[in-house]
Amino acid sequence: NDCYYCGIRKSNSQVDRYRLTMDQILACADEGYVLGFRTFVLQGGEDGGFSDEAIADIVRCIKERYPDCAVTLSFGEHPYETYRLWRMAGADRYLLRHETADRVHYERLHPDSMSYDNRVRCLYDLKSLGYQVGSGFMVGSPYQTPVNLAEDLHFLAKLQPQMIGIGPYVPHKETPFAKMEQGTVRQTLVMISMLRLMFPKALIPSTTSLGTIAADGRERGFMHGANVVMPNLSPVSVRKKYELYDNKICTGEESAQCRGCLDRRAEAFGFQIVVDRGDYIS
C-alpha cells in the first residue's frame, strides 16, 4: 500500500525492505517461547512474495509447535476467503486499524487505490470468522478534527473490537506528510482514557509511538488505561528497517530479550507484566 503517512509506503524508494524466511520466523517464536511469551504477532505488508498458503503454513507450524500460544496476524486487507484460510490454519487474532471513521478524511490520508468501504468490509469479515479483532486510529493525524475523533469512538462502539491500538501520529521524512505536525501525548492519553471507559475489558497497547515522542510515554499510557506492551522479537539485524515514522525507538528495553528491563519499569509504576496468551475476556 501507499498510505501517505507511512514511512514504509510503496513509493518510498529509500526503504531497505526485507522478508524473513520460515526458519527465521520459527526461530523468533522459539526464542520468545523460552522467554515466557505465549502470544506471537506476525506482521507484514501486503506482499506478493508470501502466498496466502505460505502464511497459513507459518501459522500451522507455530500452532503445532506451541499449541498453548495465540497467534495474531497483521497483513492488511484481503478477501474473505484468505482470512478464512488463515483462521482455519489456527490464527486467533487479527490487527487492522481503521485509521479514521470519516470517509473524506480517509481519502485525504490514502491514495485512490485504497477504499474506506473495503477497510470496513475487512473488519466485519474478520469478526464474522471468529477472530479476536483489533482496530484503532492515529491521534493527531493530518487534517484530523475533534469531530473525526468522535466518529472514531462511535465506529468502535459499533464494531466492538477486542483490541484497540491508538498512538500519536508521528511524521516520516520520506512521506507527503513529512512537514505535518505530530500528535500530542496529552491528546493520545485522553483518547486512551476514553476508550478504557468505553471498553473496560479491551486489550489496549501502550504504543511505541508514545514512547518515541515522550521518554515516559509508555508508562503514562498504562496510567491512563492501556494494558498491553508488545516487545519486539524480530531479528536484531532488521529491527531498524521497520521505520514507520522518524526516530522510532529501537532500544534494548523495547527488545523482547530485555524482559528484566520491562519488568523493572512496570514495577516502578505499580504494574506487573503477565506473559500469558492475553485472551480477551468476554
Give the positions of each predicted feature.
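Short, small-residue-enriched loops and turns at beta-alpha junctions
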Residues: 46-51, 112, 140-145, 177, ...
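Local cysteine-cluster metal-coordination motifs and their immediate loop/turn environment
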Residues: 1-10
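Auxiliary Fe-S-binding modules of radical SAM enzymes
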Residues: 33, 157-282
